[in-house]
Amino acid sequence: MTHAHITSWLITVILFFIAVSLQRSGASKAKIVQMALRLFYIFTVITGGLLLHSIASISILYIIKAIVGLWLIGAMEMVLSGMKKGKNTNVAWIQWIVAFVLVLFLGFMLPLGFDLF
């Protein structure tokens, strides 16, 4: 299940940057990519929930990682919707960067992740 989760969030991040670039260029396919991105949000949340459910003793750090992961998805949506409306997205980008760094740090630090830290 770990590999499915890593694959889903990796595809989610790639689709996010594709959606951002299409949104900036004003391409008509941006809406299709955003719908695919939202589908991968669901895959990421489901696989993350299944991973969380499979842990015998859940540390508070896993709960924090899940909350930060949901925050990251929210930040992605704030960036894309702000760009679509033509608003300033600096705050949303800062939130995205902070949440992304936190979720990666927690993901790699916890026992189900890789031994990077």
Curated annotation (Swiss-Prot):
Belongs to the UPF0344 family. It is found in: Cell membrane. This is UPF0344 protein GWCH70_0687. Keywords: Cell membrane, Membrane, Transmembrane, Transmembrane helix. GO terms for cellular component: plasma membrane. Pfam families: DUF1516. InterPro entries: UPF0344. The keyword Hydrolase does not apply. It comes from Geobacillus sp. (strain WCH70). It is a multi-pass membrane protein. The chain crosses the membrane at residues 2-22, 32-52, 55-75, 97-117.
